[in-house]
Amino acid sequence: LGLAVPVVQVVASGRLLKLGVLVKAPDALERLAQIDTIVFDKTGTLTLGEPKLTNVDTIAPDDLVLAAALATRSNHPLARAVSAAADGVSLPTLTNITETPGFGVEGEQDGETLRLGSRIWTDAEGPAASGPELWLRRGTNAPVQFTFADLLREDAKAVVNHLSKTYDVVLLSGDQKPVAKSVAEELGITNWAAEQTPADKIAKIDTMTKAGKTVLMVGDGLNDAPALKAAHVSMSPASAADISQTAADFVFQGTHLGAVADTLSTATRSRSLVFQNFGLAIGYNFIAVPLAVMGFVTPLVAAVAMSSSSLIVTLNALRLGLKSGTTPWTR
């Protein structure tokens, strides 16, 4: 009876480790098996998080180096793309640089305030890009637009389609509405919201929780960390910001989103095996103890039977490690 739960947890954690998923909390699998709603971030979670700057040829060199100087203080995928576009170029020294998660980075050069970030953060009024975007504002000058392309993870559509059959799938993105809408439509996600700040994401998760939903949050950015903590259980890719990995209950390696589905499947099967093990152990004792009291079971037989019951529970848990057929995504 004492082995019913721990042996399943050990086998499940070992199986997930082979799949490149680290289980960080002892009760994480149990909580994951209870969820009915999955909330995805977009950039770096549904996408590869390796955006490329697409309009670099139309950006003035001075604007690019200033943007890169600000971007070096952020771990956001779009900021990394700006830094990569200015690789090898000498960057100016800025002062009073601060990052506001979910909005952007601010600094000063010769008394002039510089901001690199979202449309709202920079008070930009230009046309929205068809993909992710950042804006650079220099003092009172008109903001300069930086546009990016970020590919979806190879298995994102198949995984979302698979999960949608069992769970409510939600997309909460910090990007502009056209970008979030495009990704949601491509993946078949009907419940989505754009221009979400960290506070907005927490509010959405709290609303779902109060409505009786049990939420899994999957995100990678610095601005996702509060939402990861607010959710019932959370997952983050290994490429995520350190604070997001710290906040998450699971961390998965690689570029495949299938790790999320595999972890959910493992958690569900683990819970089923725990109940089976309890049933086997209790049923065994329910039958064996009365027989022993009535003298039908000798001490030798009882000793062998006790060891056998532990073996049965262990072997039942080991079934979790057996391959359960093919999955509809690339691993």
Question: Where are these predicted regions, by residue range?
Answer:
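Short, conserved catalytic or interaction motifs in soluble domains
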Residues: L3, R15, Q34-T37, P51, ...
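P-type ATPase nucleotide-binding
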Residues: L53-H162, T166-Y167, K177, E186-K204
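Short hydrophobic-aromatic micro-motifs
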Residues: T113-G117, S236-P237, T314
